[in-house]
Amino acid sequence: MAQFDAKIFNPEVFGKYVNRIPDLKKNELLRAGVLRTRNDLKAMLNEQTGGNYITVPMKGLLDGDPVNYDGSTNISTSSTKTYSQSMVVVGRAKGWKEKDFSADITGTNFMDNVAAQVAKFWANIDQDTLVNILTGIFAMTGAANEEFVNKHTTNITSAGTTTVGATTLNSAIQRACGDNKQVFTVAIMDSMVATNLENLQLLDYLKYTDKAGITRDLGIATLNGKLVLIDDSMPKTEVVTTAPVYSTQITTAASAGDKITIGSTEYTFVANSASDTGAKIKVGADGTAAQQATNIAAKVTIDGFTITASSDKVIFTAASATNPPMPTVSATKGDDGTIVIANATDTPAVVVYNYTTYVLGDGAFDYCDCGAKVPYEMDRDPATNGGEDILYTRQRKLFAPFGISFTKASMSSLSPTDNDLKNGANWELVNDGAISKSYINHKAIPIARIISRG
């Protein structure tokens, strides 16, 4: 049996230690019904070829119009549509060397210390997996898929009020699911969004009492009757609302032979009567700083910038919606040189963030811990660094968004990578597979998002 820091390692016992470490966020998602445990899928996966991809039937709802029951009108019949949903197992593995563990593992709490770190690591990975899936399904294309994306997205970044307010959440879930909006139970948001709501006194926090009898915040609140999980791993995108403007002022005009480096190119000032072919800039007929600034602006090009002249300044204006640093600009005097320059930021960039808040409802994801053949094991490398003990961990889990199939249209291995999950080409609304596809009603899908500036 393998040893870890001279301790006997029992993988089965260690697994029990890991499993009993509470994952508060996942527990809340389970309690709220967002993650619907489907242990039956594990058996189905074993029955289908490959064991990593499964297609299951999904029954449609009864529909159609009734006829008049008057004793003379024939009763028409219709059948419910049967859709099929495809799901994929996400496999991940990670190993650590003994010294990688930050906690002291030499004492009696060895199992607790290591198991707590391993449990926290995998809880974060599961959260990342969910976010990657959500990113992917909101990147779907095609008419039916885009109807879901558009209706289930509330983007207020260009509205009169760009931050989440008292009515934003309620309006967003109504836009997504109409009169089915009561299905939503949880909103997961960045702390910046939550702080804005706290300042408006719209959040009420849940609390728990620890073993020492101390009451603490769970980091979970409620808003409009929905649970609010605060997590800074939610997506946020940097947006440049004002691009920067930089300048180089020629405070003392250059003489022939002086040099100026702009970007990666060094330019030499030459007499006004000389050729300025190549990396050369004329000093100008009068040799003034203003003439030289104009000549520089006419000569120099730098990707991402528009270069102009204003009096004795060379102005570098960044392209819209970008935030590059100022190009490198320096000057070197020749033997009888005179040039002196001063660089400045005339207009600093204004950068804001677009925050994504996900709103999830009852049964938003089917969830199954499919298990790995060997989830935990130890190995010893006796040679490296005089001997190292290594803990290997593996997991296989299924997170399937309700009403949306993983198509594996762009996947190169049995387990999808993070990029595969984020790729909209790998997702589509559940449908009947016919040539002229009939899709599930998007209002049945309890998944929505709000994009805001806070």
Predicted region positions:
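N-terminal "assembly arms/tails" that initiate or stabilize quaternary assembly
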Residues: 1-87, 182, 229, 371, ...
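Surface-exposed, low-hydrophobicity beta-strand/loop segments enriched in small/polar/acidic residues
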Residues: 52-59, 64-65, 80-88, 137-176, ...
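Long, contiguous amphipathic alpha-helices that act as assembly "spine/axial" helices in icosahedral shell
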Residues: 56, 81-148, 177-193, 382-403
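Short helix/loop capping segments that flank catalytic or ligand/cofactor-binding pockets
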Residues: 64-67, 106, 196-199, 205-206, ...
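Alpha-helical scaffold segments that mediate packing/assembly in large oligomeric complexes
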Residues: 101-178, 284-285, 428, 434-438, ...
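Extended, solvent-exposed, turn-rich assembly/linker loops in the middle of proteins
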Residues: 140-226
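Internal mixed-charge
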Residues: 222-239, 349-427, 431
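Extended, beta-strand-rich, solvent-exposed assembly scaffolds of outer structural proteins
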Residues: 241-343, 347-349
